[in-house]
């Protein structure tokens, strides 16, 4: 009697963690349904930093953030809050510590980034020196 063993091949679609994503622009939502309010996070991953916008359509609240990816979280977050400016042409930002963002229950979207991301990228630009 001859017994043959063969390796079982398991194919699983593994979703990469935020830390393992290549540099680029991304969008995630807490719901794929378009007929109800949702939370959406748009971000740019560059080197070891993630800069983006966290916007909740249910509450109308949104903020800009910058942090470091760790597994499926963004940690060491700094948030940027837009403050009134004397001139309409210049946006001023107030920086404050923020809470980590977890992506375990968020879904990636194929669509590219929106205007909120580009606004938030300017909040964390280094100041120009004369």
Walk through the language-model features, giving the residues of each.
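Beta-sheet ligand-binding and adhesion/scaffold domains
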Residues: 69, 74-130
